[in-house]
Amino acid sequence: MVPVGRTVYIGNMPPEASAEELLDLVHYGPIENVRLLPEKACAFISFLCGQVAAAFHADSSVRRISLHNRELKIGWGKPSVPPPAIVYAVQHQQASRNVYFGQLDEHVTEETLRSSLSKFGPIDQVKLIREQNIAFVHFLSIQTAMKVVTTLPMSPEWSKYRINYGKDRCAYVPKGQQQIQAHNHQ
């Protein structure tokens, strides 16, 4: 496989900005991983697909995105190929950065999920839907989510819950943005 441009460089990042705030601006398609480097005021977002990365890169360059009133600089990271284990898990198990938890007890809170699961790797977002006893935990990488999905069901304290992959929140492209993307790529 030939390495392709699927990693986008985000410069001029505010040092206090969180991954969640950055990813709230990125609704183009599934992401493999996100690396924040606050000491260098930048981040790298690796999409699963080069076309999605190109759409984000082009649209962000045109519409000029900003975070905490700072205009972000958009560029390219090093071309790369997704690791084969991740490609396989995405194709055969619908792996994503998002892990779904079902049949949760009433004592499970957003804080307990965050503290229990952060040992696997950095977390983007935790969304607990109490009425349905479910939660979605978005990690910064598919690799971390894969570790959670394969490890936790074996653990006695987690085996009573349903654990699987959910849809990456960045894969949801709002209708208005779909039209903009279609227009920009004609």
Where are these regions (language model features)?
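Conserved short N-terminal element of RNA/RNP-binding modules in eukaryotic RBPs
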Residues: 1-17, 41-42, 87-107
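RNA-recognition motif
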Residues: 2, 32-41, 79, 123-133
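Conserved RNP beta-strands of RNA recognition motif
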Residues: 10-13, 26, 42-57, 74, ...
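Short alpha-helical elements within RNA-binding folds
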Residues: 10-30, 101-121, 152
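Eukaryotic short linear interaction motifs
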Residues: 17-19, 33, 42-45, 52-54, ...
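Acidic (E/D-rich), amphipathic helical modules within compact regulatory domains
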Residues: 31-78
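Low-complexity RS/RG/RGG-rich segments used by eukaryotic RNA-binding proteins and nuclear co-regulators
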Residues: 63-92, 155-183
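Ankyrin-repeat TPLH-centered helix-turn motif and closely related helix/turn capping elements
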Residues: 109, 113-176
